[in-house]
């Protein structure tokens, strides 16, 4: 996993935690920290989390490297 994918994964996790807080407690942590949902900084954070989610979408379609190595080493597993 590349560095950019790790950063995107962290941002996606932060976004998921924020959505959980909104769903369970009606508390938007990003808005509370950065000055409300309409502030420029909050919108930037929301945008970055959204882009990170799109980048992580590619992980769904990436083949498992460990499984590929096992299949290459042992062709009868297919």
Swiss-Prot record:
The chain crosses the membrane at residues 7-27, 41-61. Its main location: membrane. One of its GO terms (cellular component) is plasma membrane. It is a multi-pass membrane protein. This is Uncharacterized membrane protein YuzA. It is found in: Cell membrane. The keyword Acetylation does not apply.
